[in-house]
């Protein structure tokens, strides 16, 4: 049995208070320490009601502190809020001492009464930039000034217009000194919490940001108890993300050392055995079958790289490995593909250079170890065909393919025959893979292909030939998976399943219901005893699981940060608000107006789906960076979802579709940088231009090289100082129309998008607008298509997406994809996905 006092630390202040509850009622817990894990689970299940009669929090204390791994408990909304109340320390939430506000103390001294001070504080935050910069400073990172979506000044003015200056100041009085982004997140969260829970909710919102360790402890507890799978628990989960990006807690020296030190590796990785190898074989057999996977002709593959190469970061190390010299400025992988003529894979000996960097995520900074582009090319060659053949029976390589609705359906489908949910949480999963295990995985995967011997040898050698370039020298990687490897998702997902198969044995694993994606695991097991056996066995074989983050029980399930219960599935509001405020910090490019609008629509919908107050769109429409110039009424319709940018989803039950059409001037002509390579473009044109594309080029005569090169070099673009002005797009409101026809969401989940007869000719999409209907009929005739089709563009390129009303709740991404799969005007969603 775990040490209850030590375990309590994982739950912050809530853990301390639960330990006190357990200590005060120790007579009720006599005998727990003499039972094995299964017996304790069974005893708690039977005693939960009796324990609750003694103290409402006692069953939670036993589950979280006295079990090897926590047991879910059915909690009413009132019981969940009782946990929230015990998670935070209200005594630390003190109103600012106005006399300490240097430069402004005399102003506050002249103001009468608390409400007057609140009004004046609200006035200053709305109108005094110097005051905001001093007492709500932006984080000291370039992206904080450029990339955040929501800034305090505009948000405060919108808040004051809706709720009044005094209400604004009454909240801000407890936030003085917070960074700008955290204050914004707190205000947005307080809006929802106050609407749901009254004035007490405002204190919880402030405490969620002021006390991040307590917020994280509460989140851990709610997940372990299963309260994350429904309201109100889901509203409080992952509140630690409200700290925003750039928390400066990452120790990169330690991160590098933990991958290169023999002692550190020995403590972290799961040793390879023949039994583990057999489990890897079983997973690969299940997902790939027995047929040999044909890899493409190497020359055909390499000369088509303009089509398949995906952008990613490119630095001096990657350039050096490819023989590219004297390049400066922002670099991307597609640029390198243009600059290299010969296929570098046959000459590759497996040597891989890794560049460490910091990824600024909401709530924490994370170390990224990016492998060089030569390694990317080599792994892409053999891994892409495997990914295309992958069945996804249990190991999911592309979770986004079926959408969150599809994910929830799979989980719910596994629950029809009874049983217990078991959600596992690997502790720092990348660090658990030994070099020998990864080499075995790649060798076994390659053995199912017709890969040449040199490639098999180089891939195997690459695992032991990986070096992190850090502080001017190369450090040999002795174990762990690099987070920026082309095979990161493949490796994690397969080994995720293989380790559990190894722990329980192949026969038992065959009988299990399980899903694996990255480091996420969902198991449906017959009994609590099976859960206990599985957890004990994973520990026995060396899997490091965080005991405070596992969850066992009947209440609900979680997979891919989606809480799933019998009535609906729900995402986590705090994480959505954090993303809404922070924006993306992957580059320092300012957001263009149309991108800003689309981002605001998607992120506001995510917040509303997860339970945000209905007044949120009004605040966002006035404060989201990049939306100036759009009419306020238009923005409110789009952000609330009652209208859409055509084509797209409309969130209404009225069967009326309201749409806006975007009118945007063409972008400035792209100028290829002087001396830029164009090998990928020229190789593709020479080797892969189809007869249909050649005919179309003859008809339309576009500047095809410039169009192709813009996709390779356009992301880097000119610097911010020289970037040409992009004219403001205009929104044109269309007449409302009645939505005709109905589709069910589950019917659309597995349905593909109908392609046109010219869809297999990718160059055409670069200049399709230059082709007249008569031009298209001539091209369609070349491939034997229907030249008399009423809509010749649909015949050529497939039916365009249409707008549909969403009768229910769906994430914007799922809803947009479903609009592409049906011509019906209404999509019925019987099981809501609130994410």
UniProtKB/Swiss-Prot annotation:
The keyword Signal does not apply. It is an enzyme of class 2 (transferase). Keywords: Hydrolase, Nucleotide-binding, Nucleotidyltransferase, RNA-binding, RNA-directed RNA polymerase, Transferase, Viral RNA replication. It holds the Pfam family RdRP_4. It comes from the Viruses. It catalyses: RNA(n) + a ribonucleoside 5'-triphosphate = RNA(n+1) + diphosphate. This is Probable RNA-directed RNA polymerase. It comes from Helminthosporium victoriae virus-190S.
């Amino acid at each position: 049995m775990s040490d209850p006092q030590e375990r309590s630390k994982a739950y912050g202040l809530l853990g301390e208070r639960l330990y006190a509850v357990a200590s005060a009622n120790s007579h009720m817990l006599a005998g727990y320490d003499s039972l094995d894990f299964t017996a304790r689970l069974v005893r708690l299940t039977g005693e939960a009601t009796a324990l609750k009669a003694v103290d409402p929090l006692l069953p939670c204390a036993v589950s979280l502190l006295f079990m090897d791994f926590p047991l879910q408990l059915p909690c009413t909304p009132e019981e969940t809020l009782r946990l929230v109340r015990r998670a935070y320390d209200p005594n630390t939430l003190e109103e600012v001492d106005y006399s300490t506000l240097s430069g402004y103390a005399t102003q506050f001294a002249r103001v009468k009464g608390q409400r007057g001070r609140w009004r004046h504080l609200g006035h200053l935050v709305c109108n005094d930039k110097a005051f905001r910069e001093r007492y709500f400073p932006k984080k000291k990172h370039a992206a904080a000034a450029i990339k955040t979506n929501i800034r305090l000044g505009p948000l405060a003015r919108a808040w004051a217009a809706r709720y009044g200056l005094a209400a604004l100041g009454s909240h801000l009085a407890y936030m003085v000194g917070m960074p700008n982004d955290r204050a914004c997140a707190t205000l947005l969260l307080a809006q929802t919490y106050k609407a749901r829970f009254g004035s007490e909710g405002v204190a919880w919102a402030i405490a969620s940001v002021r006390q991040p360790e307590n917020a994280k402890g509460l989140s851990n507890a709610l997940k372990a108890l299963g309260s994350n799978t429904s309201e109100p628990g889901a509203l409080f989960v992952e509140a630690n993300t409200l700290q925003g990006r750039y928390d400066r807690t990452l120790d990169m020296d330690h991160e590098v050392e933990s991958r290169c030190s023999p002692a550190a590796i020995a403590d972290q990785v799961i040793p390879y055995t023949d039994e583990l190898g057999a489990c890897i074989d079983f997973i690969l057999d299940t997902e790939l079958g027995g047929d040999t996977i044909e890899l493409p002709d190497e020359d055909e593959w390499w000369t088509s790289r303009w089509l398949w190469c995906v952008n990613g970061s490119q630095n001096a190390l990657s350039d050096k490995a490819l023989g590219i010299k004297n390049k400066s400025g922002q670099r991307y992988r597609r640029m390198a593909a243009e600059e290299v003529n010969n296929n570098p894979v046959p000459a590759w000996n497996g040597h891989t250079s890794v560049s460490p960097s910091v990824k600024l995520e909401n709530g924490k900074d994370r170390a990224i170890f990016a492998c060089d582009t030569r390694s990317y090319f080599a792994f892409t060659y053999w891994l892409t065909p495997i990914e295309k053949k992958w069945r996804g029976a249990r190991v999911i390589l592309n979770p986004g393919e079926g959408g969150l609705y599809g994910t929830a359906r799979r989980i719910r489908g596994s629950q029809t025959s009874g049983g217990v949910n078991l959600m596992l949480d690997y502790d720092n999963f990348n660090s658990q893979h030994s070099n020998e295990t990864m080499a075995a995985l790649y060798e076994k995967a390659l053995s199912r292909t017709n890969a040449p011997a040199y490639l098999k040898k180089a891939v195997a050698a690459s695992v032991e030939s990986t070096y992190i370039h850090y502080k001017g020298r190369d450090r040999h990687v002795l174990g762990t998976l690099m987070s920026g490897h082309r095979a990161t998702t493949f490796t994690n997902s397969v080994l995720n399943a293989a380790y559990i198969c190894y722990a329980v044995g192949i026969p038992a694993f065959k009988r299990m219901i399980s899903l694996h994606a990255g480091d996420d695991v969902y198991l449906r097991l017959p009994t609590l005893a099976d859960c206990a056996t599985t957890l004990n066995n994973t520990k026995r074989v060396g899997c490091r699981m965080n005991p405070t983050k596992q969850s066992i029980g009947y209440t609900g399930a979680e997979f891919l940060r989606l809480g799933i219960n019998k009535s609906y599935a729900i995402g986590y509001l705090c994480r959505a608000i954090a993303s809404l405020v922070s924006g993306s910090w992957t580059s320092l490019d300012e957001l263009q107006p149309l991108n800003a609008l689309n981002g605001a629509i998607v992120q506001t919908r995510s917040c509303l789906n997860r339970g945000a107050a209905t007044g949120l769109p009004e605040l966002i429409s006035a404060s989201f960076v990049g939306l100036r110039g759009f009419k306020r009424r238009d923005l409110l319709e789009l952000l609330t979802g009652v209208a859409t940018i055509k084509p797209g989803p409309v969130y209404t039950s009225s069967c009326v579709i309201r749409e806006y059409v975007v009118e945007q001037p063409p972008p400035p002509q792209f100028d290829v940088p002087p001396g830029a390579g164009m090998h990928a473009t020229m190789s593709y044109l020479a080797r892969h231009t189809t007869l249909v594309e050649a005919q179309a080029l003859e008809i339309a005569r576009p500047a095809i090289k410039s169009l192709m090169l813009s996709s390779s070099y356009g992301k880097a673009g000119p610097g911010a100082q020289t970037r040409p002005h992009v004219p403001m797009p205009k929104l044109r409101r269309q007449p409302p129309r009645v939505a005709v026809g109905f589709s069910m969401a589950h019917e659309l989940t597995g349905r593909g998008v109908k392609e046109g007869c010219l869809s297999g000719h990718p160059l055409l999409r670069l200049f399709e607008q230059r082709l007249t209907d008569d031009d298209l009929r001539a091209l369609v005739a070349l491939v034997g298509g229907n030249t008399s089709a009423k809509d010749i563009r649909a015949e050529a390129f497939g039916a365009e997406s249409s707008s549909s009303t969403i009768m229910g709740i769906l994430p914007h991404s799922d809803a947009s994809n479903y609009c592409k799969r049906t011509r019906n005007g209404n999509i019925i969603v019987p099981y809501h996905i609130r994410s």
